[in-house]
Curated annotation (Swiss-Prot):
Mg(2+) binds at D77, E145. Homotetramer. L-glutamine binds at G355, L383, G384, M385, Q386, E406, R465. GO terms for molecular function: ATP binding; CTP synthase activity; glutaminase activity; identical protein binding; metal ion binding. NCBIfam families: PRK05380.1, PyrG. PROSITE patterns: GATASE_TYPE_1 (PS51273). This is CTP synthase. Belongs to the CTP synthase family. ATP binds at S20, L21, G22, K23, G24, L25, D77.
Length: 541
């Protein structure tokens, strides 16, 4: 959408008291509401950690790595941004302190700062500001979420940068939205506003006066407590807005609109607009209430103890359930447990997600064998596809010591191997060295995968260093494993099927990154609907 406003307005979303309050979802909801009023938006995440990107961070600690179309390994909040607004993110939309310092050192070594003493102020701050102001899409609103919590040492350069942006652009082109926690103290049965007051005081000490305070709470505050926050935080009472706990994140845009968040933002900017068209959000909420059938999908992974490790995957299954009228329940199965200790008997389908390393591989392979032998629908994604090949090679094709060189570098039959051409030079580089971003996959005529996509080609996102060894394609095919999708740019099998199985598909790419609540991804939709069909057929037999 072409921008209507000139110049662009900037919205900065900060957080206080504790982390994980939902700043990313608040920013995404603001973007969705402004879109619903006809404006164009661009969302960015500013992360204060010193990693260049989250690509080498453990999902158990940081959550999933969301891969952008241009190959960026980014924070999971960018996934929320894409799903809520439909605006494709790029690697430039995730700015980390590590990325800033890396660029700074490169510039210093190149002589760009010749004669100067390179310091946090102005050099680091100026680089952050240039990332914030970069708006090549000409959006009406740029929404920047600042990671971390106000008071953290590492976030101070980013807070100083947004303070300077507000000073340089003038107040009527910027707005500060601060999300805090209003905890409920069960012993006295009260909601407490003091942490919010202290958080705003901390932010104000850094030169930033919030214009809107969003308070995360289990219940809406009475008027007198909102007035108390307004008085002690120097914020208009109309701008003290509830960010209530919800059972469904897709309720948030409608809830925030009901609480007048978008109205107050536009009032601050003195911008007129029609009321938002929230029809698509209301439709999503309506669909979420109409599910009649139920299925259980077991996700067998090694990061299942972290709620954020498989965010996009969980949302993609939810989208498929919304658009099929099926209630999808996820059973999390810890692959780090021995295979003898996991129970899949109540699972209607099995999903093996992506991952790295050999921890939990044996249990995942046993789960794949269980699905294959018992005609249970199975979807393998990235590593899940590779393990499906290993399982088939060992147990059906009888290939001795079939394995991946990721797990056993000297195996006799490397049916999965490292992709050539990913390493340049003698030094082994872990970060950013994989096959990343969107590539085209050609689908075989007459295959199940082609009928699912209703197309002979598909563009999906990748994040992998290992792939199926094409030298074993023929021998595996002769034993009944059909390779029905191949990379357009290299000799690399990317889709497999078992033709005689009710639904058994492996894909090397990550389809979950392109599913939205408004348009379920066809692969997940087929997986969910076919699972219900198989369940009903087995119950009749």
């Amino acid at each position: 959408m072409v921008g209507k406003l000139n110049p662009t307005r900037f919205i900065f979303v900060t957080g206080g008291v504790v982390s994980s309050l939902g700043k990313g979802l608040a920013a995404a909801s603001i973007g969705a509401l402004l879109q619903a009023r006809g404006f164009s938006v661009r969302l960015r995440k500013l992360d204060p950690y010193l990693n260049v990107d989250p690509g080498t961070m453990s999902p158990a600690q940081h959550g999933e790595v969301f891969v952008t179309s241009d190959g960026g390994e980014t924070d999971l909040d960018l996934g929320h941004y894409e799903r809520f607004t439909g605006v494709m993110k790029t690697r430039a939309d995730n700015v980390t302190a590590g990325k800033i310092y890396h660029e700074l050192i490169v510039k210093e070594r190149r002589g760009d700062y010749l004669g100067q003493t390179v310091q946090v102020i102005p050099h680091v701050i100026d680089l952050i500001i240039s990332c914030i102001l970069h708006n090549d899409a000409g959006a009406d609103f740029v929404i920047c979420e600042i990671g971390g919590t106000v008071g953290d040492i590492e976030s101070q350069p980013f807070l100083e940068a947004i303070r300077q942006v507000s000073y340089r652009l003038s107040k009527n082109l910027t707005i500060f939205v601060h999300l805090t926690l209003v905890p409920y103290i069960g012993a006295v049965g009260e909601l407490k506003t003091k942490p919010t007051q202290h958080s705003v005081k901390e932010l104000s000490s850094l030169g930033i006066q919030p214009d809107i305070v969003l308070y995360r709470s289990r219940a809406q505050l009475p008027q007198y407590q909102c007035a108390k926050i307004a008085n002690f935080c120097n914020v208009a009472e109309d701008n003290i807005i509830a960010a209530l706990d919800v059972s469904n994140i897709y309720m948030l845009p409608v809830m925030y609109h009901e609480h007048r968040l978008d109205t107050q933002i536009l009032k601050h900017f003195d911008v007129d607009s029609p009321e938002p068209d929230l029809t698509q959000w209301e439709n999503v909420l309506r669909m979420s209430e109409t599910a009649s059938d139920r299925i259980v999908i077991a996700i067998v992974g090694k990061y299942v103890t972290s709620l954020d490790a498989y965010t996009s995957l969980e949302e993609a299954l939810r989208h498929a359930g919304l658009h099929s009228g099926i209630r999808v329940e996820i059973k999390w199965v810890d692959a780090r447990l021995p295979a003898s200790e996991i129970d899949l008997t109540d699972a209607d389908a099995i999903l093996i997600p992506g991952g790295f390393g050999d921890n939990g591989i044996g249990t995942k392979i046993c789960a794949i064998e269980y699905a294959r032998v018992n005609n249970i629908p199975m979807l393998g994604i990235c590593l899940g596809m590779q393990l499906a090949v290993i399982e088939f090679a060992l147990n059906v094709a009888g290939i001795e010591d079939a394995n991946s060189t990721e797990f056993k570098s000297d195996c006799k039959n490397p049916v999965v191997c490292e992709l050539p051409g990913l390493q340049v030079g003698d030094e082994y580089k872990m970060g950013g060295s994989m096959r990343l971003g969107s590539y085209t996959c050609n689908l075989a005529p007459g295959s199940r995968i082609m009928s699912i996509y209703d197309s002979s080609t598909v563009v999906e996102r990748r994040r992998h260093r290992y792939g199926i060894n094409p030298e074993y394609r023929d021998v595996l095919s002769k034993c009944g494993l059909a390779f029905t999708g191949a990379a357009e740019d290299r000799d690399l099998p990317e889709v497999l099927e078992l033709p005689d199985h009710p639904w058994f598909i492996g894909v090397q790419f990550h389809p979950e990154f392109q599913s939205t609540p408004f348009k379920s991804h066809p692969l997940f939709l087929s997986f969910v609907t076919s699972t219900l069909q198989v369940k009903k057929a087995s119950s009749r037999s």
